[in-house]
From Swiss-Prot:
Tissue note: Expressed in circular and longitudinal muscle, pseudohearts, pharynx and gizzard. Also expressed in male germ cells at the proximal pole of primary spermatocytes in 16 cell-stage morulae, and in the distal parts of the spermatocytes in 32 and 64 cell-stage morulae. In the spermatids of the 128 cell-stage morulae it is expressed at the proximal pole of the elongated nucleus and the distal pole near the base of the flagellae.
Region listing for Actin binding, Actin-severing, in residue ranges: 186-295
Species, as recorded: Lumbricus terrestris
UniProt keyword annotations, A-Z: Actin capping, Actin-binding, Calcium, Cytoplasm, Cytoskeleton, Developmental protein, Repeat
Record has Calcium as a keyword: yes
Region (Actin-actin interfilament contact point): 106-109
Main subcellular localisation: cytoplasm
Region (Disordered): 235-257
GO cellular component: actin cytoskeleton; cytoplasm
Gelsolin-like repeat residues: 56-141, 179-225, 287-322
Domain of life, source organism: Eukaryota
Name of the protein in question: Gelsolin-like protein 1
Family assignment from sequence similarity: Belongs to the villin/gelsolin family.
Length: 367
């Protein structure tokens, strides 16, 4: 398990033009995928959550006991299958691709491509979503009732069963409210401690839970659950719960925080004035033109067109029925290109075909 933040450029794929399609990456993906993708076998046949990880252009299933745990060096595809009407047998889908902050452009492109492939496999019924580490949508976070856990490195390092006596220290930060608890690994430095949150210092056979004086009950409870799970995996490990103000500076918890800090690049997304853009392909090239700003409602959308609705904290691509035949991958790419020109390039992207269910979109056009 990696202990410090990886030195590679974070969100390196962000500045890519995502020119995956027709590229060597696409050819490699198609070659590995062949006629059918074996990972999709059985996908979408019953309600529930399925997760896959991208490994060398291939889609590999992510174990159910690892659901909610992601590594920042990896990319994942998440499929949620549900019944909009409990009285009906009809199934609906949301398919997300999640990109870690240290994920490569190839992984980003492969995840995006494979998400479109899964959409096609499910007869174009899913709503597609792009999720970026630290900027996940509320819909995505709500899948994981125990909260999201983001760890350093790739899953390859995570699956090595390191003996506790050889374990490299790590500091886990628990933040959020109610069901929206976010757990992520941070540098081993005292400056990262926040009185409003809870932390776990994992030293292998010694575990400390540090409760900030202003932390919430939900954060403390989540950390306690996490600590219990760690102890079940390491029966010989000893755990101690520490309170912020009553723990002396000489305590091993503090003296163990000897790492090097790294800048925290995650900045909260902020709701901004709505911006509605129309996508056209005049001259054979996709381009966007602003239609309006401010309040947007259903009457602003036409079945013969494609629109981007940018709310600052989210980006929606609405595809009219008359444009379904156009390659869906293009809609992810055009929204990615649009966001690159804004101050919120990592906002969640939702691709919605006319008539599909998307609660966040309905809220956005009703505001």
């Amino acid at each position: 398990m990696a202990t410090g933040l990886i030195k590679a450029k974070e969100y390196d794929w962000k500045d890519s033009n995502l020119a995956l399609f027709g590229s060597d990456t696409e050819k490699q993906v198609k070659k590995d995928s062949a006629a059918t993708e074996p990972a999709w076998k059985g996908a979408g046949q019953k309600e529930g959550l399925k997760i896959w990880r991208i490994v060398n252009f291939k889609v590999t299933e992510w174990p159910q006991n690892q659901h909610g745990k992601f590594y920042n060096g990896d990319s994942y595809i998440i499929l949620n299958t549900y019944k909009p009407d409990p009285k009906s047998n009809e199934l609906a889908y949301d398919v997300h691709f999640w990109i870690g902050s240290q994920s490569s452009q190839d992984e980003y492109g492969t995840a995006a491509y494979k998400t479109v492939e899964l959409d096609t496999f499910l007869d174009d019924k899913p709503v597609q979503h792009r999720e970026v580490q630290g900027y996940e949508s509320e819909l995505f976070r709500n899948y994981f009732k125990q909260g999201l856990t983001i760890l350093e490195g790739g899953a390859e390092t995570g699956f090595h069963h390191v003996k506790p006596t050889e374990y490299k220290p790590r500091l886990l930060h628990f933040s959020g409210q109610k069901q929206q608890i976010y757990v992520h690994e941070v540098p081993l430095v005292k400056e990262r401690l926040d009185h409003k949150d809870v932390f776990i210092l994992d030293l292998g056979l010694t575990l400390y839970q540090w409760n900030g004086k202003e932390s919430s009950k939900e954060e403390g409870f989540k950390a306690m659950q996490y600590l219990g799970l760690m102890r079940s995996e390491r029966p010989k490990a000893e755990a101690e719960t520490l309170e912020d103000e009553s723990t002396p500076e000489s305590h091993k918890f503090y003296t163990s925080l000897t790492g090097t800090d790294e800048p925290n690049l995650v900045k909260p997304l902020v709701k901004e004035e709505n911006q509605l853009l129309k996508v056209s392909d005049a001259g054979g090239h996709l381009k966007t033109t602003e239609v309006k700003r401010g309040a947007v409602n259903s009457k602003d959308f036409s079945s013969n067109d494609v629109f981007i609705l940018d709310t600052g904290d989210q980006c929606f691509v609405w595809v009219g029925k008359g444009r379904f035949a156009v390659g869906e991958a293009e809609w992810t790419r055009i929204s990615h290109a649009h966001l690159m020109k804004t101050c919120h390039p990592l906002a969640p992207i939702h691709v919605i075909k006319e008539g599909q269910l998307c609660k966040a979109f309905n809220v956005a056009i009703a505001a």
